[in-house]
């Protein structure tokens, strides 16, 4: 780049080797101190982070200087002359085909904004950093964009008025360009595939998490657990049903096998039964004669009654028998017992005797032996002899005879065995009577 492109107020020229632009604004104050301001527009940081940090630092320094110092503005006329002198050679070199990057850069509006000197309170001059306002200078931002599109250029060291060399820095991108790119990328985000992505959606990173795989494994595990629990519940239900059936069957068998033994109720719980009336049995048929209804005791009593007066009568003759026991031929009772007893058979109805009254003779008369009849005759003879002494004896004899006849009549209808027994008794009685007489 030609030295005419850069013009200072004091007439010093500095030209970088690579065509980069370095501006030096030197202003002389009253105290004679010189402040040198160098702004390297083409040499910026290599990466975006350094450019952003540098711009932030310059803004902070400007604020601090404004608060603690007084800023004095230089006349715009001097700066405008230098800028006009710079524009003419730039247009000439654009037609010649040289590097366009350093030519198109203008500092017209920067000159308007400020080449300022900071004067301290003690009168010393502090170096003032020239800052750019991107909001005011739209044209400058557009030109910077054109410079970045053409390529990267390394700035050569520039010589200042004092003979110092400034080392230019390699520039990759400007801070404004990076900020604009960031805003464009934030406004219109695109995925790796080039498709527009929704605002708020997560970007598609190159790696994948294992959460999905773990979720699938969890689902499979829970499904298996549910199947196991269902199988266990079914087994438990089946076992309970079987146990109920077995219990019911056992209960039925027990009910069939059980035999309850009831104890009898005690008697005091029961009401006493009413007393039963004993009914006498009436015989179905009447007896043939009133003699059949008589008892043996009654017949025995009659016989005893008949014998008692006889004994009383015989007691009168006991004295005579005691005086002459052999005269009357009394036999001992032992001999009478030793004599054999004759048993008579019952007679047939044709053999029965008939009494003079027209009644049949009793069967007892046939049973009595023939010896009894002479004894009766003897009794009658004795009665006649006794009549001489007393009449009542005859009457008693007749009573005895009639009683014997009644006894014989009463035993007519008795069974043959009873007849035999009574016949034996009558024989003994007759023998006893005979012995007494």
Swiss-Prot record:
Any one GO MF annotation of this record: microtubule binding
Phosphoserine modified-residue sites: 208, 415
Keywords: Cytoplasm, Cytoskeleton, Microtubule, Phosphoprotein
Feature: compositional bias, Low complexity: 41-55, 360-371
Annotated compartments: Cytoplasm, Cytoskeleton
Region (Disordered): 1-22, 38-210, 254-437
Listed GO CC annotations: cytoplasm; microtubule
Biased composition (Basic and acidic residues): 58-86, 151-167, 408-437
Tissue expression profile of the protein: Expressed in seedlings.
PANTHER family reported for this sequence: PROTEIN WVD2-LIKE 4 (PTHR31358), PROTEIN WVD2-LIKE 5-RELATED (PTHR31358:SF29)
Protein name listed in UniProt: Protein WVD2-like 5
Native species: Arabidopsis thaliana (Mouse-ear cress)
